[in-house]
Each structure stands twice: as C-alpha cells, then as structure tokens.
Amino acid sequence: MGTKGREIVGEGVDKIIEKLNKALADEWLAYYQYWVGAKVVKGPLREPISAELSEHAGEELAHADKLAERIIQLGGTPLLKPEDWLKMANCGYAAPENPCGAAILEQNIKGEQCAIGVYDALLRELKGKDVVTYDLVLEI
C-alpha cells in the first residue's frame, strides 16, 4: 500500500510523513497528559473532571492510531520510541504537577489550542495535494 500512496501524493511525501509523525508525537503526549491527569486530579469536581479527561485520552489514542495508519499507507514508519515523542512533538508535554482540577484543565486546553494550530497549518499545506491525508486531518 505504501508504494501506491507515495505515487498518488507525489513529491513532498517524505515531508508529509515527517509532519504526520510530529502530529503522532503530539497525540501520544496528549493521550498521556489526559490519562495521567485523570488519575491525579484532586478537588471537589474530581469525578467529572476525571471522566472528561479519560474520554479525551481515548480520543487522542484514536487520533494516534489513524495517523500511524496513514504514515504506513504513505510508506513511512510511525515513531518507534517514546523518547522520540518529546523530540518530535510540536506541542510538548505539560506534566500535571499541580493536581488541582482547574490547573489540569488549563494545561490541557493549552495543549488543544496548540494542536488546533498544528492541524490548521497542515490542512493549508495539504489542500489540493493529498486528499486522503487532508480528509484525515480534517476529521481529527
């Protein structure tokens, strides 16, 4: 499948794969940030905040899966080592050192704002060049 995907996308496919791997790194870090935040959150609204964070963690994991599949379809290899996530990520990782619900939510909102910017730039770059990847990013 990788050969056909590369053929359809044409020149620039390696750059697209690199950007998808950077987005994949972001999704893995976002997954962990939501997941660990759901575990350590404290305060009177702990239960609903934990439930919301857990739901978002599942969404981020699904995004990572879709990105990895597309990278493979294009003939690339998804990032293989967790240490590469921090090196490649656009948005980084904010450890939930303050377990207060409001602080954890604020960290995650900042992460989502960064992801929106990354995906917006990727959409502009992909428009008219790679319809399949464009649609995937739009879905995410």
List each language-model region with its residue ranges.
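Disorder-to-helix initiation segments
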Residues: 2-23, 101
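Conserved alpha-helical segments that form or flank metal/cofactor-binding pockets of metalloenzymes
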Residues: 30, 35-37, 41-84
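Charge-rich, acidic-biased intrinsically disordered regions
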Residues: 5, 10-11, 47-48, 54-55, ...
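Acidic/histidine-rich alpha-helical segments that form the ligand environment
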Residues: 19-26, 30-33, 37, 65, ...
